């Protein structure tokens, strides 16, 4: 399941973020890649724990926790702190699958990467290339969103970032460990939750709503890991 979550940051916020990123000291993106992924990764990244990355990441996670669409789709349990990257001068990341487990720097806790997320920080007109290409059950999806928009997709997906041939592409990315690890089960719960919300708006007093809501929670109880 791929999910587009728009408008997490406004234009003024994004302009300030990009201005700060232009002044930042960047490191080789291979630092946080696994052995196989490092062979395909050609980009820049703010070092893990960088103050600016923490500031952007904290604001992003705080907003997502207040975004019902994200909460319903991801059912988040743990989140790996967001990282910030930059693609320019032909920078790219070849096809790869993200590592199954991630351990935040300085933390003993590990995060299972059930879901991957990319928040676009650059206006799409400001750079050429840089599409996030995801292979899923419906074929190949090419994603290049407006600045401030985010895409959520299964961590099991084979994906790449096309070379950036003009300008620079800033983005935040992170992983979520869901309460429900199976993507098909999460998708079913998301569809049920959407149906419940729509029925609540259309026929709020319908007696079947109580039964449907109960079924949702019973399925969540069966599948959730806490």
From Swiss-Prot:
Binds 1 Fe(2+) ion per subunit. GO terms for biological process: DNA damage response; intracellular iron ion homeostasis. Its cofactor is Fe(2+); L-ascorbate. InterPro entries: Oxoglu/Fe-dep_dioxygenase_dom, PKHD_C, PKHD_hydroxylase, Pro_4_hyd_alph, Pro_4_hyd_alph_FE2OG_OXY. GO terms for molecular function: 2-oxoglutarate-dependent dioxygenase activity; iron ion binding; L-ascorbic acid binding. It comes from the Bacteria. It is an enzyme of class 1 (oxidoreductase). Residues 78-178 form the Fe2OG dioxygenase domain. Its EC number is 1.14.11.-. Fe cation binds at residues 96, 98, 159. 2-oxoglutarate binds at residue 169. The keyword Oxidoreductase applies. Pfam families: 2OG-FeII_Oxy_3, PKHD_C. Keywords: Dioxygenase, Iron, Metal-binding, Oxidoreductase, Vitamin C. HAMAP family: Hydroxyl_YbiX. This is PKHD-type hydroxylase PP_0862.
């Amino acid at each position: 399941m791929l999910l587009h979550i728009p408008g997490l940051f406004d234009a003024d916020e994004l302009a300030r973020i990009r201005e700060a990123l232009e002044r930042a000291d960047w490191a080789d993106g291979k630092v946080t890649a696994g052995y196989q992924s490092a062979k395909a990764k050609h980009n820049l990244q703010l070092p893990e724990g960088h103050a600016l990355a923490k500031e952007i990441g904290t604001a992003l996670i705080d907003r997502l926790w207040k975004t019902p669409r994200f909460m319903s789709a991801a059912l988040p349990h743990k989140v790996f702190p967001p990282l910030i990257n930059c693609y320019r001068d032909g920078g790219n990341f070849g096809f790869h699958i993200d590592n199954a487990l991630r351990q935040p720097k300085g933390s003993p806790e590990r995060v299972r990467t059930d879901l991957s997320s990319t928040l676009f920080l650059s206006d799409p007109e400001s750079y050429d290339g840089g599409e996030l290409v995801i292979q899923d059950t419906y074929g190949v999806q090419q994603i290049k969103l407006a600045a401030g928009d985010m895409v959520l997709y299964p961590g099991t997906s084979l994906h790449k970032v096309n070379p950036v041939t003009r300008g620079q592409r800033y983005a935040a990315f992170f992983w979520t460990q869901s309460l429900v690890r199976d993507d098909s089960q999460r998708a079913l719960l998301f569809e049920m939750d959407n149906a419940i919300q729509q029925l609540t708006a259309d026929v709020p007093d319908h007696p079947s709503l109580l039964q449907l809501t109960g079924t949702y929670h019973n399925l969540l109880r069966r599948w959730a890991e806490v």
